[in-house]
A protein has these predicted regions:
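FAD-binding core/adjacent interface of flavoenzyme oxidoreductases
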Residues: 26-109, 194
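A Rossmann-like FAD-binding core segment of flavoenzymes
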Residues: 31-38, 54, 128-222
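Rossmann-like NAD(P)H-binding beta-loop-alpha module
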Residues: 95-136
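N-terminal Rossmann-like dinucleotide/flavin-binding domain of flavoprotein oxidoreductases
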Residues: 1-58, 149-166
Length: 325
């Protein structure tokens, strides 16, 4: 996404998000700016955060993953009290300027907790924006960028080292004011921990009655349909393809959109749905903060300023495509 570019100072927050209300203007779609608090799949009812309920005949879920503060706080004590969560972007975007203001008064010691693509990109974005700050990546596992091919892991490691970012290949055990304690017992002085741990399934799915995977995400088949409730479909990071597990990536979420539309249209017309076949390889672009990026396509990889400009062109184009004046 474009959040690392926002952190690095390349974009404003408004340039990183798609405003749904203007996009839906002039359509027959009813826009409800609410959050879901409960889903009863058997009763075909969704409950919203204002207490209202919506009954449905068919349901499509694409709420995306969340950073469950309560769950994260249980796994990493002190995270809720002392950490800055990168999700949701609206909350993070409102608080990030306060970190920048702090950096004007003192050299900051920052730690990014979470060694996935989000944490890696965030580290390098912070380094670009705050060159005087010390930046540490607490990876959380024994291998950096574990989901990438070996050559890409080497590129990522070299990029972090070249930017003076310290990488710790162990987990954080708890956070308190001014420091992060690691599982080894060592402590790291830290003015602001940035929480970029793996996203989680929304808590309300647990009591929904839907078939879920081991991590609590909605299980779906090749039609993006729930195997337990055939009138409920799901796509994007909130779901898991049980026939073909996929990385939780925006690319796969976007590719599932047209297939979801096709199948919803089909079942409403009484026509059998068709399987969605995700591509074997997708273009993965990892930004390095300073107008530089690493590209991955299957086993092929490349890096350079041209990769960043390609990523910038793709990201801006996607936002523009779904934005209205």
């Amino acid at each position: 996404g474009m959040v690392p570019g926002f952190v690095a100072g390349h974009y404003t927050l408004d340039q990183c998000v798609i405003q749904l209300e203007p996009l839906l203007k002039g359509t027959d779609i009813t826009w409800l700016p609410r959050s879901v608090t409960a889903l009863d799949a058997n009763a075909k009812r969704v409950t919203l955060d204002d207490g209202s309920a919506l009954d449905f005949d068919w349901l499509s879920v694409n709420t995306g993953p969340v950073q469950d503060r309560k769950k994260t706080g249980a796994l990493l004590p002190g995270a809720r009290e002392h950490g800055l969560f990168v999700r949701p972007i609206e909350s993070f975007g409102a608080l990030w300027p306060q970190v920048l203001a702090m950096a004007h008064t003192q050299p900051l010691r920052l730690a990014v907790i979470g060694g996935g693509a989000a944490g890696i990109e965030l580290c390098m974005a912070v380094r670009h924006r705050l060159p005087k700050a010390s930046v540490t990546l607490i990876n959380g596992s024994s291998e950096l960028a574990a989901n990438y091919p070996e050559r890409v892991r080497q590129r990522v490691s070299q990029a972090l080292k070249a930017r003076g970012i310290v990488v710790l290949l162990e987990r954080a055990s708890h956070i308190q004011a001014g420091e992060v304690t690691l599982e080894s017992g060592a402590t790291l002085a830290c003015d602001m921990p940035l929480i970029a741990t793996s996203a989680q399934a929304p808590a309300w799915l647990q009591s929904s009655g839907l078939a879920l995977d081991e991590q609590g995400f909605i299980a779906v088949d090749a039609f993006q349909r729930s195997p337990s409730h055939d009138r409920i479909f799901a796509a994007g990071d909130v779901s898991t393809r049980m026939d073909q597990p996929l990385p939780r990536s925006g690319v796969y979420a976007v590719r599932a959109g047209p297939a979801l539309l096709t199948n919803l249209t089909a079942v409403l017309a009484g026509v059998p749905p068709v399987p969605h076949l995700p591509p074997k390889n997708t273009l993965n672009l990892l930004s390095c903060g300073d107008h530089y990026a690493i590209a991955t396509w299957g086993d092929y990889s490349a890096q350079g300023r041209w990769v960043w400009w390609l990523k910038d062109w793709i990201d801006r184009g996607f936002i523009k495509r779904y934005s209205r004046p």
